[in-house]
């Protein structure tokens, strides 16, 4: 988070969301858990990482957000990391699985909002 003094901490996704949500017309979902030993992220399904995905999507949907949501799984491959290799089928399956997980998370959130 370059808005903080050095040494900069990792950006807090919820804090960031609170500053941009009124200007957001698109939500891009990628979730992960930071591994300081590797100095890199372990990517997860949406809502399973430290990206506050559930909280952010719930806030957005409860506030009437009805625009686009895109995914960037990084589970099978990472475009900027040549060390991760996967077949075309594995990449395809990863995107489908990630999309289904996001759909399930959104359905859960919608039920939570309805029951609130």
Provide a role label for each language-model segment.
Residues 2-116:
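Histidine-acidic metal/acid-base catalytic patches
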């Amino acid at each position: 988070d370059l808005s903080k003094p050095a040494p900069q901490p990792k950006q807090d996704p919820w804090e960031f969301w609170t500053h941009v949500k009124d200007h957001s017309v698109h939500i891009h979902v990628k979730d992960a858990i930071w591994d300081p030993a590797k100095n890199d992220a372990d990517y997860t399904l949406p809502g399973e990482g430290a990206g506050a995905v559930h909280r952010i999507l719930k806030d957005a949907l409860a506030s009437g957000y009805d625009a686009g949501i895109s995914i960037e799984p990084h589970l099978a491959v990472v475009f900027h990391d040549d060390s991760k290799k996967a077949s075309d089928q594995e990449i395809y399956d990863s995107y489908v699985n990630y999309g289904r997980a996001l759909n399930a998370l959104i359905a859960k959130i919608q039920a939570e909002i309805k029951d609130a």
